[in-house]
């Protein structure tokens, strides 16, 4: 078993091994006293893995209740969040009980925010079942829901007590969800690991799941350990997300998160080339690897619409934005720019 220890406001382990889902209760019991467990999942994942997770938790002595919601970013809203809170209250969950997020990034964000705020905080465990969640969103403690004005506008930092990652669950991933995870993985290689970029170029992610998850989680461990609350170094994880979130919002979330991040990375790198921050070769190699993994690199949404979406980005502070910009494969810099300058950056990135 691969175990990565995360040092944050709450310390915990990320466990990675084929077959761990059936040991979820046993592993959870090592960090959380048996009581009640609330499985929060979307209807797609629950149909695949709900019964096995219940069985594993009950075997370890947990009394299990389940809450499911329709799959997709459209459910990550205040209404579903309130439904989870009502569910916890109706079943008389206490602060000593645990919410188990079974699913991808939407499930983890929503379940984590509910766990963070129900009775001012209760137990929280992550069982990621998508590649994106396994390598990124299940680790680091960011939880949130979307508002009509923008993505992840209401949320909190709330670390889990454990992350249990069974790569076997990735075998049922739809191809588009696999690609989404690959976008985040490529992001990690771009922001700080050139050797990893070469590995991804030569060997498909699906042929090295455990290794890829371990590398990404170790990188995130180091970043979160230095900057848990996103005030400095952790901002580098936003590579591709500034323009990506705008594209995602303009699509009304019909575009998946990883696809939007891929477009965001391509856009900011084009702009970096035009501004002399990085070379043409870096852009060419990034576009090549994104296309190898079947990811988009351009958007047809107009500049005005994307710029309007940028204006509600939660990363804006004091009229400024910290934009993460590639300098070369495995190295980025942070450009602090006025919000109005985002329009010029998008134009330089090929958006019209």
Residue ranges and their predicted role:
Residues 1-97:
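ATP/NTP phosphate-donor binding region
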Residues 15, 113-202:
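A glycine/threonine-rich phosphate-anchoring loop and its flanking beta-alpha core
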Residues 31, 92-94, 117-118, 146-147, ...:
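Solvent-exposed alpha-helices and their adjacent loops that cap or buttress functional pockets
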Residues 84, 111-115, 185, 247, ...:
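Buried hydrophobic packing segments
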Residues 106-113, 134-135, 246:
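Short glycine/serine/threonine-rich phosphate/pyrophosphate-binding segments
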Residues 183-185, 278-352:
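C-terminal charged capping/lid subdomain of soluble metabolic enzymes
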Residues 198-305:
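Active-site segments that bind and position negatively charged phosphate/pyrophosphate groups
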